[in-house]
């Protein structure tokens, strides 16, 4: 073959026109600890810090690279392609520690790859002359260095280590077909023949232990996972549950073996590999176990939810039971007898109500009886890497169902569907096709699995059906071919082929790159070794390739073309058509020199039929396709604004067909669209694969650590192409990214701050900190301004300073809307919606996969993703790896509709991801807002005052399922309660309660005296309605359930309440407060004031004998012992009248039984702040409680309790540990939500622990360290 030079010149270095720079690569954990560091490395100047980090961390060889090398002469190889080995003699002159080391120059990596490909290409007779080989090597090195193209990760890891450095090792059980003899050979060297393939499809037979069977598959998968590759298999040959075995028994079924494979993959992943095992499981829709398979992940997610919730409920009750036993002072084992220990009896009842197993309750009591003081019961969370997810199955694979057209047509026609036995084809079960379709849609909605393979469409485009059908794919579903074959990937960065002057794709450069990289991937098949003999043989016979592209989203946005537009789809289709057409033409050209792939002859007619169908689609034909069940979406020439692309697309397919008819093809497949996760970062791609962009503001990594905000580089270029002036572009960018200072900000600026007492020095300090801030609230704090200034000038108290939720701007009197307006000005909106000068008709150009920023509303529709895939699919040999993002409020029906549209538009596969469908993913706040409650309040205000009480009562009555009619219960004329003052979203709220004689709540008053008359009247009538309901027996729990989490203004931060720190409305705040105080609902508090820890102070057997009281007025006070010299306490004295030093945040409180009918002797009156919710049985227990409360405690108990209290409170280790854990969790959640606002998924990277994960095909990748679960 003749190789043209387009980027380099003969006799000149590949890098002559490329500037390089010194760099330091460092990746840190969020806590600042260094994960990886490599200093003084050389990289191309255009490489970003992220690209530098990925190259240095993942692709530089870290050890075994000799400092001094020598060439190994080969007579039949040009000298510039001679391989190198360590110069042992020269190395002996160096200190031993300096003889071997790491690659430190990007040129070492580029030369290692390009040189190895040229070396094997020469040996395989791919080049006509030495100059062609030299041009091939130089052009490839140049394209790697300029980020035009990148191969998949295994090429970077393995290729060239033997050729460039002489690195070698014993064989690892791999095989290869000798390219010169055609004989299958077992590898003796680990590196001479590298493993460059990322994607594998493996067969599995219905055999337990023999080669090619079930257990053998786990071994073959393990070998692939160990080296970072992914694999997929169709398990439909395995018999269903209950099918007969040859030995006379019955099969345990498909699912039992899938769970074994899942465990094996998970163990390998956790055994030290750099990323999760990438695995695809496929099952045909007519398999007898298909229903269980579809529900597999749904059920496992439910198990996780049960583990997480159940573990916390059980732990709570078991600790309470243990505490009731330990804090008891009775004799003769009475503490462990619920009949004699009322506190224990109460806790057992509460545990039984929450379904805690009785044998575990008994076990804890026995444990306490043996002298133990505390119990450890492990709780779980929904983190992806937590033990809860590790405990359940099905978490280590992507699951897909393979559907044929007859099933989909049965769904359309509401027909029946048969599930058939694997051996004899007997019908095992018949069900409605729509029922199975509903199950698939629900599972995708609930757990993001399964994806779908449209099997008929896959096989209609199959180039080699003589050997059998396509049954499976790799984990990301872009490579679809015969079982036991492999594919190595490479992707072109489309944006790098855009001409800076013409603003169009340089088609000649693009076609040149496609041609050369088709040769690279073909040579890679020749030089490769494979993990099994079957894959080695079949890969040699079919020689499938995986050339693709990335950055179509970035290209379209930078060109001012919406992703969701006919023009955008036409350009994507034309570029895809050129790529595959030129690649097949190159394959035919190689076949003319070296012969077609060995299995071409029996598949000639089918392959040429497929090529003709590709050509018809490129020519824009809507009819005349051969052997297709569903016609593709043809290229619409008129929609493409660059007609040169159309001309080259049609010419490429004309040539591909012409040369193929003449020579055949060297490769059965040549192209796919892969996720391009890690390699996309190396190429600094804005978008991966065929994906749109995910954010308009990016966070660029700095060499010394940290990030700074920059506008997506496609935005200014797009605005220029749309005709905006430079000054307008600057304003639009500043709106998105922020101005970085308060100088011209609305409401909060130097003038208004000076009026509040700020000096020029303090304003300058604020402006300096704002340059890198994500939110202005994070800058107005004691670390920026100094504690002395805050306390002295701004009158901030020590308590406020220590409050993590304290908002200084709120304290200074700035309104929420003013803070938000200033925040947008300073830190940016992170969206272009609302930007100055930007026309509404241009907003679509900047639509992303998700809403951008806090105020962004626009995002690409589900249909836009599917139609973009459909525009490219007719020009791809394989398929497209892509996951369709769906909003959280998408329905099961929406999922089914998306899948049905995918089939009708002739896609080969698709997968869905509904936001929040995984427990491990936090919900995006913007997706869970509910305006219904705000609408309800607005409608309420419009009503007459008399009607308002009726409406509110009706809302409550809807919540009460059944209640026995009863008379109104009157409150005492002189009644107890408490007053709680707080500020909610800047508005003062006074909540007062009135209690029945036994401590139950009977009325509330809500006073917001500075609000308008209408709002005050509404709140007053609301409180009356609630009070009437309470007096007529409506349980407080029903009000709590109805009104917590309601959302309307005023809302926001809560100050002055020790348990509640944030509320979504006044009603939310009021009923959270009442729930915590009267129901013990500490799950509704933000600061847990309960006392379940082992340092909490109780009163033994008296624990359950004190009258039920509100804890609203006692919350936050230290335990107080009433000494005997304080005298008797009158029954009429109000609760809480004892002097107690306030200690905000303390979990232990004191309450007094002050309403007894007679005076009590001085007692230890120490109880927990927990109040048991008696719900509807409190009347039955009133007499029992009245009798219990009259019992006395002797003086010895007073002294002993005083000693116990002193001892318990002297050790704060447990409390400190709990506080630290809570604070760490709070910070993690803050970082998680901040990452969501920045456009990331909110999940944490398992390698570097940063919250910088973005969706990448069916998986995710980390923008910080490049970790990915995909194949690239």
UniProtKB/Swiss-Prot annotation:
Gene that encodes it: nrdJ
GO biological process, any: DNA biosynthetic process
Taxonomic source organism: Agrobacterium fabrum (strain C58 / ATCC 33970) (Agrobacterium tumefaciens (strain C58))
Superkingdom per UniProt: Bacteria
Active site residues of this protein: 474, 476, 478
EC numbers: 1.17.4.1
Protein name, UniProt field: Vitamin B12-dependent ribonucleotide reductase
Entry binding sites for substrate: 153, 198-199, 230, 474-478, 675-679
Function (record text): Catalyzes the reduction of ribonucleotides to deoxyribonucleotides. May function to provide a pool of deoxyribonucleotide precursors for DNA repair during oxygen limitation and/or for immediate growth after restoration of oxygen.
């Amino acid at each position: 073959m003749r190789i043209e030079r387009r980027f380099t010149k003969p006799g000149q270095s590949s890098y002559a026109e490329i500037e390089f720079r010194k760099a330091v690569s460092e990746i840190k954990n969020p806590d600042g600890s260094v994960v990886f560091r490599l200093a003084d490395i050389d990289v191309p100047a255009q490489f970003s810090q992220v690209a530098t980090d990925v190259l240095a961390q993942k692709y530089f060889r870290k050890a075994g690279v000799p400092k001094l090398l020598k060439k190994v002469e080969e007579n039949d190889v040009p000298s510039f392609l001679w391989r190198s080995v360590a110069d042992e003699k020269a190395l002996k002159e160096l200190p031993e520690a300096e003889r071997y080391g790491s690659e430190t120059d990007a040129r070492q990596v580029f030369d290692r790859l390009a040189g190895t490909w040229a070396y094997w290409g020469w040996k395989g007779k791919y080049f006509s002359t030495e100059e062609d080989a030299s041009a091939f090597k130089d052009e490839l090195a140049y394209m790697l260095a300029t980020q035009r193209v990148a191969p998949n990760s295994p090429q970077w890891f393995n290729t060239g280590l033997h050729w460039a450095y002489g690195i070698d090792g014993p064989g690892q059980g791999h095989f290869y077909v000798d390219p010169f003899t055609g004989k299958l050979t077992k590898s003796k060297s680990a590196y001479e023949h590298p493993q460059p393939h990322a994607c594998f499809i493996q067969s599995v037979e219905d055999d337990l232990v023999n080669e090619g069977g079930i257990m053998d598959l786990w071994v073959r998968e393990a070998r692939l996972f160990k080296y970072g590759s992914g694999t997929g298999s169709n398990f439909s040959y395995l018999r269903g549950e209950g099918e007969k075995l040859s030995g006379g028994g019955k099969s345990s079924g498909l699912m039992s073996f899938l769970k074994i494979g899942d465990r094996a993959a998970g163990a390998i992943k956790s055994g030290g590999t750099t990323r999760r095992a990438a695995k695809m499981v496929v099952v045909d829709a007519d398999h007898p176990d298909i229903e269980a398979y579809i529900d597999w992940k749904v059920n496992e997610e439910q198990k996780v939810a049960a583990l997480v919730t159940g573990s916390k409920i059980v732990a709570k009750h078991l600790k309470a039971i243990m505490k009731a036993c330990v804090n008891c002072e009775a004799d003769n084992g009475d503490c462990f007898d619920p009949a004699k220990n009322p506190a224990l009896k109460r806790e057992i009842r509460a545990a039984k109500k929450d379904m805690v197993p009785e044998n575990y309750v008994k076990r804890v009591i026995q444990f306490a009886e043996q002298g133990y003081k505390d119990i450890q019961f492990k709780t779980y969370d929904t983190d992806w890497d937590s033990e809860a997810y590790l405990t359940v199955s099905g978490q280590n694979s992507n699951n897909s169902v393979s559907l044929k057209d007859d099933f989909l047509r049965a769904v359309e026609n509401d027909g029946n569907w048969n599930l058939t036995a694997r051996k004899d084809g007997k019908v095992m079960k018949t069900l409605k096709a729509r029922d199975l379709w509903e199950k698939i849609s629900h599972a995708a909605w609930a757990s993001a699995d399964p994806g779908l393979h449209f099997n008929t469409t896959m096989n209609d485009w199959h180039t080699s059906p003589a050997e059998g059908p396509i049954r499976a794919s790799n984990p990301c579903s872009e490579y679809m071919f015969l079982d036991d074959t492999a594919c190595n990937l490479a992707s072109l960065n489309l944006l790098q082929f855009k001409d800076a002057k013409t603003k169009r794709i340089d088609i000649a450069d693009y076609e040149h790159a496609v041609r050369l990289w088709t040769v690279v991937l073909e040579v890679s098949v020749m030089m490769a070794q494979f993990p099994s003999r079957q894959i080695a043989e079949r890969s040699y016979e079919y020689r499938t390739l995986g050339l693709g592209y990335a950055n179509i989203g970035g290209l379209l946005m930078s060109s001012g073309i919406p992703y969701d537009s006919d023009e955008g789809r036409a350009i994507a289709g034309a570029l895809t058509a050129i790529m595959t057409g030129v690649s097949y033409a190159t394959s035919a050209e190689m076949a003319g020199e070296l012969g077609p792939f060995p299995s071409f002859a029996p598949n000639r007619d089918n392959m040429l039929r497929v090529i003709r169908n590709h050509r018809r689609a490129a020519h824009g034909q809507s009819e005349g396709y051969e052997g297709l069940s569903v016609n593709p979406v043809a290229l619409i020439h008129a929609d493409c604004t660059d007609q040169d692309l159309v001309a080259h697309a049609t010419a490429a397919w004309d040539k591909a067909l012409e040369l193929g008819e003449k020579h055949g093809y060297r490769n059965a497949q040549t192209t796919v669209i892969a996720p391009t996760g890690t390699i996309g970062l190396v190429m600094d791609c804005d978008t991966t694969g065929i994906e749109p962009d995910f954010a308009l503001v990016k966070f660029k990594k700095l060499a010394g650590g940290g990030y700074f905000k920059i506008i997506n580089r496609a935005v200014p270029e797009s605005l220029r192409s749309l005709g905006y002036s430079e000054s307008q572009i600057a304003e639009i960018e500043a709106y998105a990214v922020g101005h970085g200072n308060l100088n011209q900000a609305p409401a909060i600026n130097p003038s208004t701050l000076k009026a509040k007492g700020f000096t020029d020095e303090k304003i300058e300090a604020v402006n300096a900190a704002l340059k890198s801030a994500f939110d202005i609230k994070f800058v107005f704090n004691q670390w920026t301004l100094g504690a002395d200034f805050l306390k002295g000038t701004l009158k901030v108290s020590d308590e406020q300073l220590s409050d993590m939720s304290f908002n200084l701007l709120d304290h200074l009197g700035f309104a929420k809307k003013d803070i938000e307006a200033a925040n947008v000005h300073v830190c940016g909106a992170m969206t272009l919606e609302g930007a100055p000068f930007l026309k509404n008709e241009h907003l679509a150009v900047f639509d992303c996969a998700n809403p951008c920023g806090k105020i962004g509303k626009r995002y690409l529709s589900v249909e836009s993703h599917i139609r973009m895939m459909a525009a490219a699919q007719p020009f791809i040999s394989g398929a497209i790896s892509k996951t369709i993002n769906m909003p959280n409020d998408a329905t099961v029906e929406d999922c089914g509709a998306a899948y049905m549209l995918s089939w009708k538009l002739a896609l080969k596969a698709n997968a869905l991801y509904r936001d929040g469908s995984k427990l491990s993913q936090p919900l995006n706040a913007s997706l869970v807002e509910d305006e219904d409650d705000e609408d309800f309040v607005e409608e309420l205000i419009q009503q007459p005052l008399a009607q308002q009480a009726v409406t509110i009562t009706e809302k409550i009555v809807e919540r009460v399922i059944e209640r026995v009619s009863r008379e109104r219960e009157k409150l005492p004329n002189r009644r107890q309660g408490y007053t709680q003052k707080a500020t909610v979203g800047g508005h003062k709220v006074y909540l007062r309660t009135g209690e029945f004689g036994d401590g139950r709540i009977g009325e509330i008053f809500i006073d917001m005296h500075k609000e308008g008359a209408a709002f005050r009247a509404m709140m007053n009538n609301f409180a009356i309605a609630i009070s009437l309901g309470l007096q007529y027996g409506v349980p407080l729990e029903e009000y709590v359930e109805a009104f917590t989490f309601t959302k309307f203004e005023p809302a926001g931060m809560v100050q002055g309440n020790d348990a509640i720190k944030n509320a979504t409305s006044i009603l939310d705040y009021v009923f959270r407060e009442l729930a915590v105080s009267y129901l013990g609902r500490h799950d509704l508090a933000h600061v847990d004031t309960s006392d379940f820890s082992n340092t909490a102070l109780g009163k033994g057997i008296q624990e359950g004998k004190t009258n039920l009281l509100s804890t609203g007025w006692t919350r936050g006070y230290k335990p107080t012992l009433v000494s005997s010299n304080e005298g008797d306490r009158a029954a009429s004295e109000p609760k809480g009248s004892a002097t107690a030093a306030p200690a905000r945040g303390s979990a232990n409180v004191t309450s007094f039984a002050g309403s007894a009918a007679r005076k009590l002797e001085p007692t230890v009156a120490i109880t927990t702040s927990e109040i048991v919710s008696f719900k509807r049985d409190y009347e039955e227990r009133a007499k029992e409680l009245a009798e219990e409360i009259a019992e006395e405690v002797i003086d010895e108990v007073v002294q002993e309790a005083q000693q116990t209290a002193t001892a318990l409170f002297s050790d704060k280790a447990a409390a400190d540990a709990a506080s630290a854990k809570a604070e760490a969790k709070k910070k993690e959640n803050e970082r998680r939500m901040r990452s969501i606002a920045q456009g990331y998924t909110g999940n944490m990277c398992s390698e570097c622990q940063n919250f910088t994960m973005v969706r990448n095909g069916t998986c995710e990748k980390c923008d910080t360290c490049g970790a990915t679960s995909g194949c690239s």
